[in-house]
C-alpha cells in the first residue's frame, strides 16, 4: 500500500537540479527506438538495440523534517532477528516492505525501470540531452544480451517537473507497471517519491538530485541520488577560493530560489564558517540583473553561483552588463555545459567549475578507451554535450549495479540491487581517470574527487587546472 507522504513529503522547486556533469545535474525526442514519446506517458524499451557495440569498460565488481516511519530500516551491523537480507555489510529488513516476497524474488526475462522525467515544461530541452545518453547506454547493454540474458526495459512518464505528477507516476509505476527500480530528476520529484518507494522496497537509483535528507541511509535505505553531495562540493569550492585568496576575501552568492539552489547556498555558507572568507551578500538570481547589481554594491571579490544548469550563463552576462568583473567566479558542477559559457562570451572567461566527467569532444581524449566506447554508443547530435554524458553515466552506474547484484549470492532481486548500490567502488569509463563512484553501507560518497576546470573564452573550452582534489573524506 502506498502512503501519503505528509507535510514533509517533497520539496517544491520549479526547476530540477539537473545533472551535468555534471549534472551538473548542468532533456525527450520521439523515435521508435527507445525515445520518449510526446504523450505524457510513454514506454521505451531498448531491447531492440544495435547489434554491435564495444564491451563495457570496467567489470561489475536538504530538507529538514522527521524521518519516514514507514520505510524499512537499514544498518550495517549484525543481522536482526526479523527477516532481512545482507551482503557486503549492508542489510535491509524486508519484513517491513509492502510486499516482502517481491523484494527477494529473482528477476528474470525483463528488468523494468520506471523513469519519471520532465518531458514537457521549462527544463524539458535540457532533459532531452540526458535521456539521449541514458537510452543509448541501456540500448548498448541490451544489444549485448542484457544482464545475464535479462533485458532492461525503461518506461518513461512525464512529470513536467511537478512533484505531485512525479508522485502520481510513481504510483502507476509501482502498482500497475510493477517496475523493479525507479529514477527521476530533481529535488522535488525525489522528495515526492522517497517515502513510498522506500515503503515498497523499490530502489530509486541515481536520481538527478542531492538532497541531504535523502542521503540518510538509515531512514532512506532504498534511495540513491546521483549528484555530488552539497557539503563535499562546497568544501571544494571554499578550497579553491582560499587558494587564490589566502588572506581572505569577500564573497557574494547568486542564489537560485529553488530547493536545489538554496541547498547549495547553505552548504557553501556552512563550509565557509571558520575561514577568513566573508559572505558579504546573498542575492536571489531570479532576476540576474538585480542579483548582479546587489553583488556589485556589496563590493565582493568572488561570486559563487548557487544554482542549476541554466543559471550560470545569465548571471555572468548580467555582471558584464553592469560593468562588474569580480576577481573570481566559481560555479557549481552542474554548470559544466559549455553552451552557456559560449553565449556569455568574453564575460565568462576565467569562470571556475569542478568537473568529474570526461569531455568526449576533447581531441586529447580521442584515443581514450572510455570515450571511444561512449562515442560508439551515443550517436545523437548532442553526444558531446556534458549533460548527455551525465545521462549516459547514470545508466552506466545502473548497469554496473545490476551486474554486481546478479553476480552476488542474493541475485538480481530488489534487495540484491540495493545491496549492490551500497557497495560500489567503480571507475566508470566516462569518469576522469582517477575518479570513482563510491558507496558503502553507511555513506554515499558518490564522486570521489573533482578536477578544477577554467573556461577559456578564446578557445570556447574548459581547460584543466591542476590535479584531482579528493572529496571522499579519506
Describe the residue ranges of each PLM region.
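Segments of small-molecule ligand-sensing domains
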Residues: 378, 384-388, 399-461
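Solvent-exposed, acidic/polar segments of extracytosolic/periplasmic ligand-binding ectodomains
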Residues: 64-70, 76-100, 104, 426-474
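Extracellular/periplasmic Venus flytrap/periplasmic-binding protein
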Residues: 164-165, 213, 221-325, 363-365
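Extracytoplasmic "Venus flytrap"
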Residues: 90, 94-135, 157-163, 187, ...
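Bacterial lipoprotein signal-peptidase II cleavage site
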Residues: 25-39
Amino acid at each position: 500500500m502506498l502512503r501519503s507522504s505528509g507535510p514533509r513529503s517533497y520539496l517544491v522547486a520549479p526547476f530540477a537540479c539537473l545533472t551535468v556533469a555534471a549534472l551538473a545535474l548542468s532533456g525527450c525526442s520521439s523515435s521508435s527506438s527507445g525515445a520518449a514519446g510526446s504523450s505524457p506517458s510513454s514506454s521505451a524499451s531498448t531491447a531492440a538495440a544495435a547489434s554491435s557495440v564495444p564491451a563495457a569498460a570496467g567489470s561489475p565488481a536538504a530538507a529538514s523534517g522527521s524521518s519516514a516511519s514507514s520505510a524499512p530500516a537499514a544498518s550495517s551491523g549484525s543481522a536482526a532477528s526479523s527477516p532481512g537480507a545482507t551482503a557486503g555489510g549492508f542489510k535491509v529488513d524486508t519484513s517491513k516492505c509492502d510486499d516482502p516476497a517481491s523484494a527477494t524474488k529473482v528477476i528474470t526475462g525483463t528488468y523494468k525501470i520506471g523513469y519519471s522525467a520532465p518531458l514537457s515544461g521549462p527544463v524539458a530541452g535540457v532533459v532531452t540531452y540526458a535521456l539521449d545518453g541514458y537510452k543509448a547506454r541501456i540500448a548498448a547493454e541490451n544489444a549485448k544480451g542484457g544482464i545475464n540474458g535479462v533485458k532492461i526495459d525503461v518506461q518513461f512518464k512525464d512529470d513536467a517537473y511537478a512533484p505531485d505528477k512525479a508522485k502520481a507516476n510513481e504510483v502507476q509505476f509501482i502498482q500497475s507497471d510493477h517496475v523493479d527500480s525507479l529514477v527521476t530528476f530533481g529535488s522535488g520529484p525525489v522528495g515526492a517519491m522517497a517515502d513510498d518507494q522506500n515503503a515498497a522496497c523499490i530502489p530509486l537509483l541515481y536520481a538527478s538530485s542531492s538532497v541531504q535528507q535523502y542521503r540518510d541511509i538509515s531512514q532512506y535505505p532504498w534511495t540513491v541520488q546521483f549528484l555530488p553531495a552539497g557539503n563535499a562540493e562546497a568544501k571544494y569550492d571554499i578550497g579553491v577560493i582560499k587558494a587564490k585568496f589566502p588572506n581572505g576575501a569577500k564573497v557574494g552568492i547568486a542564489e537560485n530560489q529553488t530547493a536545489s539552489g538554496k541547498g547549495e547556498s547553505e552548504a557553501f555558507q556552512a563550509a565557509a564558517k571558520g575561514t577568513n572568507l566573508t559572505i558579504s551578500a546573498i542575492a536571489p538570481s531570479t532576476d540576474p540583473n538585480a542579483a548582479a547589481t546587489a553583488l556589485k554594491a556589496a563590493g565582493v571579490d568572488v561570486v559563487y553561483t548557487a544554482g542549476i544548469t541554466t543559471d550560470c550563463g545569465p548571471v555572468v552576462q548580467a555582471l558584464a552588463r553592469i560593468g562588474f568583473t569580480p576577481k573570481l567566479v566559481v560555479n557549481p558542477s552542474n554548470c559544466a555545459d559549455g553552451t552557456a559559457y559560449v553565449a556569455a562570451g568574453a564575460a565568462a572567461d576565467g569562470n571556475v567549475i569542478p568537473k568529474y566527467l570526461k569531455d568526449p569532444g576533447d581531441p586529447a581524449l580521442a584515443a581514450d578507451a572510455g570515450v571511444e566506447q561512449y562515442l560508439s554508443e551515443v550517436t545523437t547530435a548532442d553526444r558531446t554535450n556534458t549533460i548527455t554524458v551525465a545521462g549516459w553515466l547514470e545508466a552506466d552506474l545502473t548497469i554496473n549495479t545490476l551486474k554486481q547484484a546478479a553476480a552476488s549470492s542474493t541475485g538480481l532481486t530488489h534487495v540484491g540491487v540495493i545491496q549492490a548500490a551500497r557497495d560500489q567502488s567503480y571507475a566508470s569509463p566516462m569518469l576522469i581517470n582517477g575518479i570513482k563512484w563510491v558507496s558503502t553501507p553507511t555513506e554515499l560518497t558518490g564522486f570521489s574527487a573533482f578536477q578544477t576546470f577554467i573556461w577559456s573564452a578564446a578557445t570556447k573550452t574548459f581547460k584543466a587546472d591542476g590535479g584531482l582534489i579528493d572529496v571522499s573524506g579519506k
